[in-house]
Amino acid sequence: MPYIPQSQRQEIDPAIDQLIEQMVSLVKKQDQAERIFPGVLNYVCTRIALGVAKGVFGRMRYFLLASLAGVFSNISSELYRRVAAPYEDGKIISDGDLDEFD
């Protein structure tokens, strides 16, 4: 879950907000933002994850790799649960469900 204490959020959010602005600007400069966006997001997330892990622990070890893989898996699950599923539920209501799901 992406939840940390408010005090920690206040400490790190300004840097995250600045990074978001830079990423938005970079992607919007491109002709096909929908093509560029996934690569930029992947690059930034990977650099942050590996950079923090190496900065804290010094070198890669199995527990770090397992932890990082688990975190990215949880991010995917949480994003789907909180954002994609409600979006899809709305589309079912507006466009109709598949007959095969009945």
What are these regions (language model features)?
Residues M1-D102:
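Solvent-exposed interaction surfaces and binding hotspots enriched for charged
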